[in-house]
Amino acid sequence: MPLRDDGVLRGSLVLAVFTLFGLGLAYSLIATGITGALFSEQATGSLMRVDARVVGSALVAQPFTDARYFQPRPSAAKYDLTAAAGSNQARSNPDLLARIATTRAQVAARDGIAPEAVPGELLTQSGSGLDPHLSPAGAQVQIRRVAAARGWPEQRVAALVQATTEAAPQFGLLGQPRVNVLALNLALDQAGNGESGRGNGVKQAH
């Protein structure tokens, strides 16, 4: 007796087409439209601009080598967005311990502080290698260097750190107080009569 599909094949094709276009296309367009309308800044990457020029994203760390700027956490990915990753080295790894010791000495010399005063976040890399934030303590240890490089009183730089500190916990539950390094450096430039874009400081994002 021959098999009969009784419309099963047709129904399966209709379901497949509906799933493909309904969920694969229509849902994506609707979700994109809603997020673009309600969260336009976040939907486009939380980009930060100076005079309509994109200088970075609030979500992605970038390197700052100029002494006039605050430095972010170290990055195993060299701040490369396409290679985001941590070092994946265990705490017992001799290479990790040697790198931490070297970084501790470098940061202490750079910021004029005792080696034991260097916060752990300035010694270790985040899981993504692109963490855009520091704790207030991670920013505060850099105030002396930044103030000296700019010829400003330390209190002026400290006030900007305080002003750009994001309160926590978020929604009353999540996170700790933090400072977005790019936002802080842009605030420094704004307070310093538009120094952004010079040297190796805040630059246009590519």
From Swiss-Prot:
A GO CC term attached to the entry: plasma membrane
Primary localization class, coarse: membrane
Gene Ontology molecular function, alphabetical: ATP binding; P-type potassium transmembrane transporter activity
Record flagged with keyword Translocase: no
Membrane-protein topology: Single-pass membrane protein
TM spans (from-to): 14-34
Superkingdom as given in the UniProt entry: Bacteria
Classification via InterPro entries: KdpC
Keywords tagged on the record: ATP-binding, Cell inner membrane, Cell membrane, Ion transport, Membrane, Nucleotide-binding, Potassium, Potassium transport, Transmembrane, Transmembrane helix, Transport
Record localization: Cell inner membrane
HAMAP family assigned to the protein according to its UniProt record, in alphabetical order: KdpC (MF_00276)
PANTHER family found in the cross-reference section: POTASSIUM-TRANSPORTING ATPASE C CHAIN, POTASSIUM-TRANSPORTING ATPASE KDPC SUBUNIT
Biological function: Part of the high-affinity ATP-driven potassium transport (or Kdp) system, which catalyzes the hydrolysis of ATP coupled with the electrogenic transport of potassium into the cytoplasm. This subunit acts as a catalytic chaperone that increases the ATP-binding affinity of the ATP-hydrolyzing subunit KdpB by the formation of a transient KdpB/KdpC/ATP ternary complex.
UniProt record similarity statement: Belongs to the KdpC family.
Subunit-structure text: The system is composed of three essential subunits: KdpA, KdpB and KdpC.
NCBIfam families the UniProt entry points to: kdpC, PRK00315.1
Name of the protein described by the UniProt record: Potassium-transporting ATPase KdpC subunit
Species of the source: Xanthomonas axonopodis pv. citri (strain 306)
Gene: kdpC
